[in-house]
């Protein structure tokens, strides 16, 4: 099956954000509606959740959310007849490949990438020294400078060539060291974490057993506080003469390779660490940072455009300002004239209404007089008729 496409990851990001994650993680309750809408059996959904929740914290970050969405879609569409027993390598986030390798080593009781025999483990000493000498620090910084990205971050896979040159450090121990300095399982680590990570590998290469925890001052370093490389208060302050004389030079071959071309990229991969899907799709520490940087660039371009448009409009407005003022004055004068005409019309209408009432009264009086004259005429006509009748009778 193909890797996750960038467009697919962006689609999952929109869904992820719409569910309003808390601390960049989603709970089972927040995902319940999506899981139910898939109409997959509960047994399959549980198996998919177990595969997706790589760090076993009961919540899914964005990378784990991408995994569960892709697995659900592939099962629904028939691309996967059944839920796989383990994640395919192309679906494993690069930031969590070390966790999966460590979990395999614990669950299976062995490590496919190189086990530690009991006899070899017995040879390891417990006098692990957290102190980073100036010489070692200089070596670690050279390695860091050769592999850090533009944000000053280091990926686990970017040091594959260094891992290949370690003869006494199995892959499981490299993963353990990475998890020790990267407790939040980020895809990348900063400079302070890188220096401590390389120091742990250096100590392990020289026969020191990797401890299970880190001093409090280093935990503060991993929390982005000011680092303190002199940890004599928490660990043994000095290194014995026998240790110094018998100490193996760390990453000597690797330093010789990068000495002539610090910026060269490594193409060597011994197969111990398959490169998983890069969910960031761009350089950066996380999607939120990349998104904000893009938005900032868009806003800067928009601001430049607005400033240029405003400048052009200002130049044009200086030429047209006088004409605009005259036009506005003319429009207001016409409005005033219109309002005055309306007022005059209203006054005249009121006067005309008074004159009309007087005329109506005159008409009514004339009508009454006409009626009276008509009655008088009728009476006289009747009298004339009687006189005419009398004259006729006398004849």
From Swiss-Prot:
Family, per entry: Belongs to the END3 family.
UniProt keyword list: Actin-binding, Calcium, Cell membrane, Coiled coil, Cytoplasm, Cytoskeleton, Endocytosis, Endosome, Membrane, Metal-binding, Repeat
Main location: membrane
Function as written in the Swiss-Prot or TrEMBL entry: Component of the PAN1 actin cytoskeleton-regulatory complex required for the internalization of endosomes during actin-coupled endocytosis. The complex links the site of endocytosis to the cell membrane-associated actin cytoskeleton. Mediates uptake of external molecules and vacuolar degradation of plasma membrane proteins. Plays a role in the proper organization of the cell membrane-associated actin cytoskeleton and promotes its destabilization.
Induction: Regulated by GCN4 and induced in response to amino acid starvation.
Bilayer topology: Peripheral membrane protein
Residue span, EH domain: 8-98, 136-225
A cellular-component GO term for this protein: endosome membrane
Gene symbol of the encoding locus: END3
Ranges in coiled-coil conformation: 285-395
EF-hand domain span: 40-75
Lineage of source species: Eukaryota, Fungi, Dikarya, Ascomycota, Saccharomycotina
Molecular function, one GO term: calcium ion binding
Quaternary context: Component of the PAN1 actin cytoskeleton-regulatory complex.
GO biological process: actin filament organization; ascospore wall assembly; endocytosis; endosomal transport; filamentous growth; reticulophagy
Top-rank lineage group of the source organism: Eukaryota
Localization in the cell: Cell membrane; Endosome membrane; Cytoplasm, Cytoskeleton, Actin patch
Protein name: Actin cytoskeleton-regulatory complex protein END3
């Amino acid at each position: 099956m193909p890797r996750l496409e960038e467009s697919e990851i962006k689609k999952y990001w929109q869904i992820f954000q719409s569910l309003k994650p808390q601390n960049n993680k989603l709970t089972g309750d927040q995902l319940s509606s999506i899981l139910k809408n898939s109409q997959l059996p509960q047994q399959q959904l549980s198996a998919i959740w177990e595969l997706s929740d790589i760090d076993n914290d009961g919540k899914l970050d964005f990378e784990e959310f991408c995994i569960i969405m892709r697995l659900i879609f592939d099962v629904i569409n028939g691309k996967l007849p059944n839920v796989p027993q383990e994640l395919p390598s192309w679906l494993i986030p690069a930031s969590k490949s070390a966790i999966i390798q460590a979990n395999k080593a614990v669950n299976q009781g062995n490590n496919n990438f190189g086990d530690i025999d009991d006899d070899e483990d017995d040879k390891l000493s417990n006098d692990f020294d957290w102190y980073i000498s100036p010489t070692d620090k200089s070596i670690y910084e050279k390695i860091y400078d050769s592999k850090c990205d533009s944000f000053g971050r280091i990926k686990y896979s970017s040091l594959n060539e260094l891992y290949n040159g370690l003869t006494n450090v199995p892959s499981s121990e490299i993963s353990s060291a990475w998890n020790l300095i990267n407790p939040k399982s980020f895809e990348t680590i900063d400079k302070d974490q890188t220096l401590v990570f390389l120091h742990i590998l250096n100590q392990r290469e020289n026969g020191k057993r990797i401890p299970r925890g880190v001093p409090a001052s280093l935990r503060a370093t991993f929390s982005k506080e000011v680092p303190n490389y002199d940890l004599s208060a928490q660990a043994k302050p000095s290194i014995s003469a026998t240790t110094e004389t018998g100490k193996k030079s760390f990453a000597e071959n690797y330093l010789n390779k990068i000495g002539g071309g610090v910026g060269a990229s490594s193409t060597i991969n011994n197969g111990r660490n398959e490169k998983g899907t890069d969910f960031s799709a761009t350089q950066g520490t996380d999607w939120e940072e990349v998104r904000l940087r893009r938005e900032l660039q868009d806003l800067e371009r928009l601001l430049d455009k607005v400033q240029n448009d405003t400048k052009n409009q200002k130049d044009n407005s200086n030429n047209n300002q006088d004409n605009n003022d005259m036009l506005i004055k003319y429009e207001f004068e016409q409005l005033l004239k219109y309002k005055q005409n309306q007022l005059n019309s209203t006054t005249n209408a009121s006067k005309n209404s008074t004159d009309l009432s007087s005329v109506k009264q005159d008409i009514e009086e004339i009508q009454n007089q006409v009626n009276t004259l008509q009655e008088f005429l009728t009476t006289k006509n009747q009298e004339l008729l009687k006189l005419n009748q009398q004259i006729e009778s006398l004849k």
